[in-house]
Amino acid sequence: MVDKVTEAAVVGGVDTHKVLHVAAVVDQNNKVLGTQFFSTTRQGYRQMLAWMTSFGALKRIGVECTGTYGSGLLRYLQNAGLDVLEVTAPDRMERRKRGKSDTIDAECAAHAAFSGIRTVTPKTRNGMIESLRVLKTCRKTAISARRVALQIIHSNIISAPDELREQLRNMTRMQLIRTLGSWRPDASEYRNVTNVYRISLKSLARRYLELHDEIADLDVMIAAIVDELAPELIKRNAIGYESASQLLITAGDNPQRLRSESGFAALCGVSPVPVSSGKTNRYRLNRGGDRAANSALHIIAIGRLRTDDKTKEYVARRVAEGHTKMEAIRCLKRYISREVYTLLRNQNRQINSIPITA
């Protein structure tokens, strides 16, 4: 009897968290065999895998949040040669019926992996695209911090004493920043209001310049990765390094998980959504998908609308047919997504050919 249980195929599900993961296992009849908590360490991953395989041959595992709390577990399971699926959020009706707990979420993940619903192929996150994503995230926060520093500089100048404001009039942005950074206020005179403004403005200017240099260094690294991964993409009209890097991140290290160009368009939020009923036959704007990728496609479309004659003719023809200019641009974004998908799938270099060094 024990041998039969061991040989039976089972499916696992994991609800991921920061400190503890909750695992569940279902049998061939989708019946829950057990649930258990495990730590989010390599030892915890080993214990989880051993516990799951104790019920039988592990067919596949459904994991929630493979890009955040479940990223470490995903890498461990993939390195072990297991079939891993990413499980999306539970159905709202099911949530209302059963309630919410970590154990219930783990069981729902196992049920989803068993039936193949609410599951997608996860990004592998072990290639150069993951490096690109980390650099882009760092750059985004640096740009945000630089913008905040500049805003505070302008705010302080507005409320500064007149003698300081007169010195800073009619300057460009970088002239202003470098002037403030070259000031040498007396740090011991922090009780004097005018001198405190000098100290504050100098500190903010130095912060701005440091972030400016940091962003420039990150841009060099991002451009090098994009040139190596997708040289043909960056050669296309109006596709810069920012847009190209975002589209690469959206596709992921394993773009083969995108089975068709329409799937990539839906992922980017540029595929029309049917809203037909009865005699009404129409489509509406897709407000879903990766909005960062949608923004990248929009930037490319606007750039081509300014520089490419064929794009201008296409938009003019669409407008003449009765569409608005915005609707024509949405159609254009759909065509651009098809072009990008083809380039990503047909590129000579495999995106994940150079793994991250452990």
Residue ranges and their predicted role:
Residues I234-K235, Y241-K325, S353:
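Phosphate-backbone recognition surface of nucleic-acid-processing proteins
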Residues Q43-R60:
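Short, basic/hydrophobic alpha-helical segments
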Residues T137-E232:
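Glycine-rich, often acidic, oxyanion-interacting loops/wings at catalytic, nucleic-acid
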Residues V2-D27, A109, A142:
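Gly/Thr-rich phosphate-binding beta-strand-loop-beta motif of the actin/hexokinase/Hsp70
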Residues V19-Q43:
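Short glycine-rich, Thr/Ser-proximal phosphate-binding strand/loop in the N-terminal lobe
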Residues A320-A358:
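Basic, amphipathic alpha-helical segments enriched in Lys/Arg and hydrophobic/aromatic residues
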Residues Q78, V84-P122, E130, V134, ...:
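Short alpha-helix plus adjacent loop in nuclease-associated cores
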Residues L58-Y69:
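Short glycine-rich phosphate-binding loop at a beta-alpha junction
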